[in-house]
């Protein structure tokens, strides 16, 4: 076999690196045995070495202008040693035989914006473990995680970063290998196998990707030749002091080419279906987490990072050019406009989706309130619809919300044991009916009371308790209802898909609204955020006919109180909230219910007689 060791760098390399050699198993780590040749004024070094076996370890030995020699991991390595070791490994990335042609055909025929997107966010090392504490491999995850996700009705798996990283405590968000799948769980083709298996089961795969910053580990990208190569030299624009990381120099062509190549690599070689770009806000603002005097304004005196904006626009343009069916998702927490505008214009960034952090913060605050006080905060419940269609939003309840003392989802709920379960069911049923794609971090679906611990597996033993099994069943059923009913997902991004029925019943903390499919079929959603039952509650309906309850978060099989609206619900010619007809229903405590039109009357006269 042949090792082609090449490093494409900027002019800094040409000016600063005095020499580069390849060292490894094959030459007993001799710094002077295999020097690379500079083959262009652009700072490209190249070397061919014959007879290097696959999985052999190697590094670059880079000589700085001060004649210091530093061992560096190959920035373009496809495979690396498992931490704490950090050498690159020779690996043949091509040759995996894919079986996902039908999946790609399906994606081309079914644009994701009008399809159900319900993401199960996973940390690969702590979803489930062996009894001895060892983590599952990519292939073991394929055997265990994929059937679970399919049975639960989720449409996609999103992994926290699988790009190689040295520090477990970063959860993968401090990356040293932008082309290397972490070896914690196996080799690259094992991850390809996982993605392939997902596609065969109709499940998409999204990867977290971190182009915002990188760690200062000595073997990584930082100070690659002793100076700032991938990062800015000036710490006012080149470092995140709070995170202890470097910031990529987006104004340097070679750096943006490196990052663009990384994103395309995961789409091309690993067939992933989407990329969630982490920490976008930190890229957009030069004063992000900085005090006065700690940052440098742009050429116009502003705080916008114009070269980072240009990079993100290029990223989304290139991805959509070659992978129009791919999902590009921004974790962006500010009010930066047009994050999901595409084609790009007017400072639009070109993402497909943006995490709705405003909705997430408002709703987690609201559901944490004692119900006694919720009527004083009704605007928190309804405010999201003021801006719901300003971007293509995804509603996230992510890993960030169940760590660092924030409490698990079920422990955010006030009240006693039963009330906490009712609170989770009601909140999730409301979330599934709210416009926007969905994301839920692992563990909430089993009612885990403890916060997520990256060092431990989820508390699967909870499923030996009836309440937790019933909650797990609820998640599966509400996920499948969302997936199978077009009104719940087809039209998430304009008012044609959502209409308020009543948003003003603040005294009872009840809201009701319609979700409408392209063909006009619809679901009526009624949400009660008080532990109070209401009989003969009037809800406006759009048509004169017979309605039925098709989902109830308080159903007995889900562990609820079992109060339901059984049988036929006949609409009356009684106007309610701008709708010409209405029906009377029973509203259970803390319940969310879905209704649909079962049939229109044979004759209006016949129904009038029944009234």
What are these regions (language model features)?
Residues 2-9, 13, 604-609:
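Single conserved hydrophobic/aromatic residue that forms the stacking wall/gate
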Residues 11-55, 63-82:
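Aromatic-rich carbohydrate-binding modules that target alpha-glucans
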Residues 60, 122, 159, 198, ...:
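Conserved, mostly hydrophobic/aromatic
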Residues 62-110, 201, 220-232, 373-385, ...:
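Core domains of carbohydrate- and sulfate-ester-processing enzymes
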Residues 81, 101-114, 123-304:
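Substrate-binding/active-site clefts of carbohydrate-active enzymes
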Residues 271-273, 288-457, 462, 483-554:
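Conserved alpha/beta catalytic core and glycan-binding cleft of carbohydrate-active enzymes
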Residues 463, 470-472, 478-480, 538-570:
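C-terminal accessory region downstream of the catalytic core in glycan-modifying enzymes
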